[in-house]
Amino acid sequence: MDAALLHSLLEANCSLALAEELLLDGWGPPLDPEGPYSYCNTTLDQIGTCWPRSAAGALVERPCPEYFNGVKYNTTRNAYRECLENGTWASKINYSQCEPILDDKQRKYDLHYRIALVVNYLGHCVSVAALVAAFLLFLALRSIRCLRNVIHWNLITTFILRNVMWFLLQLVDHEVHESNEVWCRCITTIFNYFVVTNFFWMFVEGCYLHTAIVMTYSTERLRKCLFLFIGWCIPFPIIVAWAIGKLYYENEQCWFGKEPGDLVDYIYQGPIILVLLINFVFLFNIVRILMTKLRASTTSETIQYRKAVKATLVLLPLLGITYMLFFVNPGEDDLSQIMFIYFNSFLQSFQGFFVSVFYCFFNGEVRSAVRKRWHRWQDHHSLRVPMARAMSIPTSPTRISFHSIKQTAAV
């Protein structure tokens, strides 16, 4: 049957009596079919709810749909839609009161999702605190601002910005999400930009180590501006292309309502997967060189490289696995899906904390610089206290004051 004909038949089944019942309940003025734009015509929305002919200016209520997307809903609650003064239906329909009726399995999953959300919030809060502390340490310790630590600093910065944007995304409510507001789409775009910069700075980490160890190229000759361009500038046109694709092909739900792995999303997910694969190649070569050539070496530079490689070996698979999990089917059984929910939530939310620990708090240069700064502060403080006490002691016949010394020197 033709879709338009089927839709017309369904609309015909929307009874005019329902609209008259609304009027009897006091929802609007009497219908005047002869008057211009005095009522809204009977129509069906995209969900399939029947909206009967209603008077202009009336707020019409209809029972929530019994089923939608295979989920059963509570039909004792109502959805609302306004018939505008010009005789047209408002495009926005209020389904906020409609709640699904959950069976035991759905209730169990709902509970696990709520717990996973708490884990997400906790992990992001811990990560932001650790990342900000690491950022301030790199900012304060100017003595360790070599190229390697500048790269760490930028990676930490991307995680801070990404986590902040994640919190902003959580503020988007269902109505804003469905109405596809411009500011909501901007938040999604900025969030995805920082996601891409995240992985490109991980690529810069791998590129730096590969250049220094495998290619035996002097790190002093590497240009910081080149790495800054790779980490911050290259992701920009990628996200612009993704935003254009979303605008023309999937301009709905604030641009993050689709399932992971959607075709338009591969515009930015593809480069991320590519740099992850390149980083794995880099690390394979780095480990091979360390195993063959640097095993017997004990120089301080080599030790630093080894520590950096260990950190990257831990972090890169960790970050790569958390991202690639979105493309993995956890399985049909309940245990696999529940484990997937918790495992993914934990790694996604705490990865900023792991970055701070491996690249800052466990960084030997950072710890040494902090100890030196602390000892310097202690020495400075311990010198000031005795001097202040000496200045506060009154002069006596048995002691020579600072004032008397000046007078003696003058004579």
UniProtKB/Swiss-Prot annotation:
Topological domains, Cytoplasmic: 140-146, 215-221, 292-302, 365-411
Topological relation to the membrane, as annotated: Multi-pass membrane protein
Transmembrane segments: 109-139, 147-171, 186-214, 222-249, 266-291, 303-327, 335-364
Gene Ontology terms for molecular function: corticotrophin-releasing factor receptor activity; corticotropin-releasing hormone receptor activity; G protein-coupled peptide receptor activity; peptide hormone binding
Extracellular topological segments: 1-108, 172-185, 250-265, 328-334
Disulphide bond pairs: 14-50, 40-83, 64-98, 184-254
Signal peptide per UniProt: 1-19
Subcellular location: Cell membrane
Keywords assigned by UniProt, alphabetized: Cell membrane, Disulfide bond, G-protein coupled receptor, Glycoprotein, Membrane, Receptor, Signal, Transducer, Transmembrane, Transmembrane helix
Predominant location: membrane
Carbohydrate attachment residues: 13, 41, 74, 86, 94
Pfam family, one: HRM
Cross-referenced PROSITE patterns: G_PROTEIN_RECEP_F2_1 (PS00649), G_PROTEIN_RECEP_F2_2 (PS00650), G_PROTEIN_RECEP_F2_3 (PS50227), G_PROTEIN_RECEP_F2_4 (PS50261)
UniProt PTM: A N-glycosylation site within the signal peptide impedes its proper cleavage and function.
GO cellular component terms given for this protein: axon terminus; dendrite; plasma membrane
GO biological process, one term: cell surface receptor signaling pathway
Homology family: Belongs to the G-protein coupled receptor 2 family.
Function: G-protein coupled receptor for CRH (corticotropin-releasing factor), UCN (urocortin), UCN2 and UCN3. Has high affinity for UCN. Ligand binding causes a conformation change that triggers signaling via guanine nucleotide-binding proteins (G proteins) and down-stream effectors, such as adenylate cyclase. Promotes the activation of adenylate cyclase, leading to increased intracellular cAMP levels.
SUBUNIT field: Monomer. Interacts (via N-terminal extracellular domain) with CRF, UCN, UCN2 and UCN3. Has highest affinity for UCN, and considerably lower affinity for CRF, UNC2 and UCN3.
Domain notes: The transmembrane domain is composed of seven transmembrane helices that are arranged in V-shape. Transmembrane helix 7 assumes a sharply kinked structure.
Name of the molecule in the record: Corticotropin-releasing factor receptor 2
Gene: CRHR2
